């Protein structure tokens, strides 16, 4: 089983797409999900215009990932979190990573990416509106706001808290974005 955690408006084919908001697919079979793949993760171009459309998307399950996850230990093949960890506080992130590590099978993958804050500053220093939008998000609601930033070093420390071990942690691009990001894969 593969989980797409905090999926937002992106419905990833072949994954159980979970978020705290959205229409659960069985409840609204009439609604066509924004279904996509890693190769075309974002089917819409980046839009800097604030909108109130957060809950108008389809998910498979509504899950609060800040509570104990329902999946048993060592049962999940892959967990994907794209542009999501920065939407949680540092302490919430600690809990989320703990749950991800718990549910992943040995050899299971945690695929992630998040904004590259330093490169964002470098590229958008002269465009304050875009800089603020990329750093803090659009703040349509409590979920659509950035609460922390990471770099490779701080994210690696987060992954290894409480002596968690990973067979490998590799930083690489996992999804194409129109703005600077840091991505990677951690293998349990």
Question: Which residue stretches match the model-derived regions?
Answer:
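Conserved SAM-binding loop
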Residues: 3-122, 184-188
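S-adenosyl-L-methionine-dependent methyltransferase catalytic module, highlighting the catalytic core
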Residues: 89-105, 109-187
């Amino acid at each position: 089983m593969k989980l797409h955690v905090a999926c937002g408006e992106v419905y990833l084919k072949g994954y159980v797409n979970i978020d705290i908001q959205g229409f659960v697919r069985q409840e609204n079979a009439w609604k066509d999900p924004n279904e996509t793949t890693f190769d075309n993760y974002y089917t819409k171009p980046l839009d800097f215009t604030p909108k109130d459309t957060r809950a108008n998307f389809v998910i498979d399950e509504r899950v609060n990932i800040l509570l104990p996850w329902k999946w048993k230990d060592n049962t999940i093949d892959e967990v994907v979190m794209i542009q999501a960890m920065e939407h949680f506080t540092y302490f919430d992130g600690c809990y989320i990573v703990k749950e991800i590590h718990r549910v992943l099978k040995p050899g299971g993958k945690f695929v992630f990416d998040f904004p590259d804050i330093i490169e964002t500053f470098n590229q958008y220093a002269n465009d304050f509106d875009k800089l603020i939008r990329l750093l803090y998000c659009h703040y349509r609601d409590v979920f659509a706001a950035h609460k922390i930033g990471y770099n490779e070093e701080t994210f690696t420390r987060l992954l290894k808290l409480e002596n968690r071990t990973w067979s490998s942690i590799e930083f690489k691009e996992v999804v194409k974005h129109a703005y600077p990001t840091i991505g990677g894969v951690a293998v349990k």
